[in-house]
Amino acid sequence: MALLDFFLSRKKSTANIAKERLQIIVAERRRGDCEPHYLPQLKRDILEVICKYVKIDPEMLSVKLDQKDDDISILELNVTLPESEAEEVHK
């Protein structure tokens, strides 16, 4: 029965395939364009301040900016702190 379904199934038209691909491309570009230009510098500044008090790897810091509505932006900051006291920076 599966073999019969395979031969009788309708193939997608090239127009539908192209439309789906364009929708994916547009969605990816929208997602990539929403990051403000200052976000990488903000991440570096936050990392610099945290490193004054605790020694962390730059990969342990995650900064994400979400746009909820036209007038609401949420800055999400995740920092994985070291477990041992020995890694703290004393000044």
UniProtKB/Swiss-Prot annotation:
<dbReference type="GO" id="GO:0032955">
    <property type="term" value="P:regulation of division septum assembly"/>
</dbReference>
<keyword id="KW-0131">Cell cycle</keyword>
<dbReference type="InterPro" id="IPR036707">
    <property type="entry name" value="MinE_sf"/>
</dbReference>
<dbReference type="Pfam" id="PF03776">
    <property type="entry name" value="MinE"/>
</dbReference>
<keyword id="KW-0132">Cell division</keyword>
<dbReference type="GO" id="GO:0051301">
    <property type="term" value="P:cell division"/>
</dbReference>
<comment type="similarity">
    <text>Belongs to the MinE family.</text>
</comment>
<protein>
    <recommendedName>
        <fullName>Cell division topological specificity factor</fullName>
    </recommendedName>
</protein>
<dbReference type="InterPro" id="IPR005527">
    <property type="entry name" value="MinE"/>
</dbReference>
<comment type="function">
    <text>Prevents the cell division inhibition by proteins MinC and MinD at internal division sites while permitting inhibition at polar sites. This ensures cell division at the proper site by restricting the formation of a division septum at the midpoint of the long axis of the cell.</text>
</comment>
